[in-house]
Amino acid sequence: NLLHNETIYPHPPQNEFSKSAGKVSKLVSTYRIDAIAIGNGTASRETERFIANLRYDREVKVFVVSENGASIYSASKTAREEFPEYDVTVRGAISIGRRLSDPLAELVKIDPKSIGVGQYQHDVDQVKLKRSLDQTVESCVNLVGVNLNTASKHLLMYVSGLGESQAQNIVNYRTENGPFRARAALRKVPRLGEKAFEQCAGFLRIPDAENPLDNSAVHPESYPVVERMAKDLECSVKELISNKALVGTIDINRYKTQTTGTETLTDILQELEKPGRDPRTKVQVLEFDPSIRTIADVKEG
């Protein structure tokens, strides 16, 4: 949810530098802000320098974030549903900030074609293009995994086995009953059948779950296998998870069955070593050369 919004005018023609600086510094102090996202559109370089040169009472990192598709989101039905009381400029700013916090969760709200990747996207079969783009987004979402207690309907829709109505039912159930404590509670969601549960459960994460496996990519069907591994090693599942030395002693051949083969067991061991691992790397702060301000400053290297 949006806690606060302000509009500042540090650049010409208003040149309200001091007033803008005071507003930003106060917001950083009040809300204990650690990072600031700046859209890469008009006056982004000037704004980045303005924000970076201010003095704060804490360390603040400044990031320049792509605005591609933000204007389309801000005028969309999704944005109106999320923030009906704000205009398109505020919605666009919210989207840019959220992209820094969790880019995947925010970008799924935008038609991939709106991001404008590739200059020939309008020359190809639009049906095939949409299918391919949707498959790519779905693949990314399922590879990363989704926090069951914070994900929006738009993010849940891309989880394998879930559609728009099921995603909305999950959000409604969460709103009415509070956060999920276990993956098994998904079975209580209206109109979410056993087949849908089977397909989606392994991609949904619950960080504070009582069973640590609920925050991993291990599917509930494989929980008994992990429990047996832990029992054989005379430790708990919690002690086994993230213990590379213990996991390294496991002989997968002992746990093969007709339904659990070598590939599945290998995936389980990899997940036990690094549960809930995120394939995305840590964000890096990219600094622009301060000497380059106009096209005339660009020289041959």
Per-range role (PLM):
Residues 6-7, 40-42, 66, 150, ...:
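Active-site proximal loops enriched in glycine and acidic residues that flank catalytic Cys/His/Asp
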Residues 25, 29, 52-55, 175, ...:
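Signal for well-folded cores of large energy- and translation-related assemblies
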Residues 231-301:
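Structured C-terminal cores of nucleic-acid metabolism proteins
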Residues 72, 81-179, 194-230, 267-289:
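Long, highly charged, low-complexity intrinsically disordered interaction regions
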Residues 186:
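Conserved nucleotidyltransferase catalytic core and NTase-mimicking acidic/glycine-rich helix/loop elements
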Residues 1-134:
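Phosphate- and other anionic-substrate recognition elements at nucleic-acid/protein interfaces
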Residues 181-182, 294:
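Alpha-helix N-cap recognition
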